[in-house]
Amino acid sequence: MTVRNLEFMFSPASIALVGASEKRGSVGRIVASNLRTGGFTGDIQLINPRHATIDGVPCHPSVVALPHAPDLAVVATPPDTVPGVIADLARHGTRAAVVITAGLDADLRQRMLEAARPACLRVLGPNCIGLILPHLGVNASSAHCM
């Protein structure tokens, strides 16, 4: 095992949320809110093909529509979409991803990892609460703030 690309996971300059949502109580909305209010000073990009904005923040229709590759992506999409999202992120140049999505069976997990491998894209998850880096103001998690 190597530490290659871990700096993008633990010290990102930009973050994209794939699966941002306006739906109250959804993981995509909680993570979007946490990212915006955590104090992170880097670039935050939201991705959802059904919205132009979410809470006033511009929203991109897809990973490939992003103006630049984020250092870190947070994935909160349905299980069957995760391998394709990871493949798009890898092709776009993203080097780390946190997959909050739960419910990936063994085949989907394997396809996700195979999509990440050619680009050495580091993956945390699936089925995790997210990633919190207090020293950077990053709350890329589905944990409700108290």
Please place each PLM-identified region on the residue numbering.
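Catalytic-core regions of core metabolic enzymes
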Residues: 1-146
